[in-house]
């Protein structure tokens, strides 16, 4: 098996991605009225970074970005959700491997594939894993954390489904389409 190094491009993407994740997570959220649960624009951006740079970049951007956001907002990290931000970034990256965005294509079929994948990933992460980790790590009440998890999953599905799809389409549209250049 060939050893695969992490490129400078990926490291830079993780750093910039984490910084933008923090800014969006701190300043571009819409409160829902349910405690510690907001409409987050940062996950739509995480989907973009993950789809472009892959699962590892998504994992690290989610982990680092969410940890820094929590430390700068609350003074400490809520590790169960930080872990899930990394997992969701990794899952978005795996979904993105099949999208072929760099060739300038993001067809209706690709949009459907992306959205089915992100719906499944968000349900797994936010409605199942995050609340379960809250119970195991912090001994939180199950009814509270599963309610938060389901609400977060639904809100992230909507945010990523709308904003994330727009970002992916805009990125793909900015790429040179395969076969569009001809030698004269």
From Swiss-Prot:
TM ranges are 11-31, 44-64, 77-97, 111-131, 148-168
What subcellular locations does the record give? Cell membrane
Where's it mainly located? membrane
Q: One GO CC annotation, please?
A: plasma membrane
Q: Could you name the domain of life of the organism this protein comes from?
A: Bacteria
Membrane topology designation: Multi-pass membrane protein
Show the InterPro entries listed in the entry: ECF_substrate-spec-like, UPF0397
Keywords assigned by UniProt? Cell membrane, Membrane, Transmembrane, Transmembrane helix
* NCBIfam families, sorted: PRK13661.1
Similarity remark: Belongs to the UPF0397 family.
Q: Which protein are we looking at? A: UPF0397 protein SaurJH9_2709
Q: Where does this protein come from, organism-wise?
A: Staphylococcus aureus (strain JH9)
Q: What is the lineage of its organism?
A: Bacteria, Bacillati, Bacillota, Bacilli, Bacillales
């Amino acid at each position: 098996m060939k050893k695969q190094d992490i490129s400078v491009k990926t490291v830079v993407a993780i750093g910039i991605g984490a910084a933008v994740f923090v800014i969006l997570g701190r300043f571009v959220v819409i409160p829902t009225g349910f405690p510690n649960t907001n409409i987050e624009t940062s996950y739509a951006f995480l989907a973009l970074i993950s789809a472009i740079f892959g699962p590892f970049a998504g994992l690290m951007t989610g982990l680092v970005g969410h940890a820094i956001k929590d430390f700068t907002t609350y003074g400490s990290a809520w590790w169960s959700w930080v872990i899930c931000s990394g997992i969701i970034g990794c899952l978005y990256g795996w979904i993105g491997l099949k999208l072929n965005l760099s060739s300038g294509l993001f067809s209706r079929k690709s949009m459907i594939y992306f959205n089915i994948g992100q719906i499944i990933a968000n349900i797994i992460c936010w409605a199942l894993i995050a609340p379960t980790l809250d119970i195991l790590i912090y001994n939180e009440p199950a009814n509270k954390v599963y309610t938060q998890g389901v609400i977060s999953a639904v809100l992230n599905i909507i945010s990523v489904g709308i904003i994330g799809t727009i970002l992916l389409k805009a990125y793909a549209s900015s790429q040179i389409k395969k076969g569009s250049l001809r030698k004269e």
